[in-house]
Regions:
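Positively charged n-region of N-terminal signal peptides that target proteins for export
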Residues: 1-4
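Post-signal-peptide N-terminal segment of Sec-exported extracytoplasmic proteins
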Residues: 41-65
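C-terminal motif of bacterial Sec signal peptides marking the signal peptidase cleavage site
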Residues: 15-18
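Post-signal peptide N-terminal segment of mature Sec-exported envelope proteins
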Residues: 27-49
Length: 223
């Protein structure tokens, strides 16, 4: 039986420009939570907002004692760490039951996190906003030498991707000092159990090393 974490119906409002060919100049602006509300957009989405209010999406799931965001650290962040840890806690009992093995590493992508967790009540709506893509969670068997490629990728990326089980130690110039898997030195010839998503397995975010997996297990979980 498939288990679904969260999914959301994304509403897109398309505004049409006039069909003339006048040259226009556009300035790029970063869109984030600090951008003020737009009254026209708010008017367009108000009917859908009311539908959400009347639905069970406002059901309270938990309470957060602090704000979690993916941008409060350079190589680590509170929200990325939370995502990776939560994925391990959910998936490891499932995989252990069917294989009698444990998950070694979790690697997701920072770009898959689309919102923040504010301090206070957490509703179903919050969960849907965080993960709108409903990616399939997979477990891959990777040899140690592929894990080395993973480490090199992460060093080059310098992003706070959600990671569990992999500890990477860099110097101030981002040169690798050492790394380990759950406190143990990597064995290049050993196989490791790595959890990721179908999007990343297909090369999303240029994580092409996942294609070198020895075996793929579908955990029947959607994020």
């Amino acid at each position: 039986m498939k288990k679904s974490f969260f999914s959301i119906f994304l509403i897109t409002a398309t505004l049409f420009l006039g069909c003339n060919h006048t040259n226009r100049h556009f300035d790029n602006k970063l869109l984030d939570h600090e951008i003020p509300d737009d009254s026209i957009i708010n008017f367009l989405i108000e009917p859908y907002t009311q539908q959400i209010i009347k639905s069970d999406l406002n059901t309270i799931l938990a309470y957060s004692p602090m704000k979690y965001t993916k941008k409060d650290g350079e190589l680590n962040s509170t929200l990325s760490n939370l995502f990776a840890d939560a994925t391990f806690e959910v998936c490891n009992p499932i995989y252990n039951e069917i294989s009698n093995e444990n998950i070694d590493i979790v690697l997701l992508n920072m770009g898959g996190i689309r919102s923040i967790i504010s301090k206070g009540e957490i509703s179903k709506k919050t969960a849907f906003e965080l993960m709108p893509f409903e990616n399939q969670i997979l477990l891959l068997k990777l040899k140690g030498d592929v894990i080395e490629e993973m480490v090199e990728y992460l060093i080059q990326e310098r992003k706070s991707h959600p990671i569990y089980g992999l500890q990477i130690n860099l110097d101030k110039n981002y040169n690798l000092k050492d790394f380990n898997v759950n406190g143990n030195k990597l064995n290049p010839n050993e196989n490791y159990n790595v959890v990721t998503t179908d999007y990343l397995l297909k090369g999303g975010d240029d994580m092409n090393f996942f294609a070198k997996n020895l075996k793929t297990f579908d955990l029947k979980i959607k994020m």
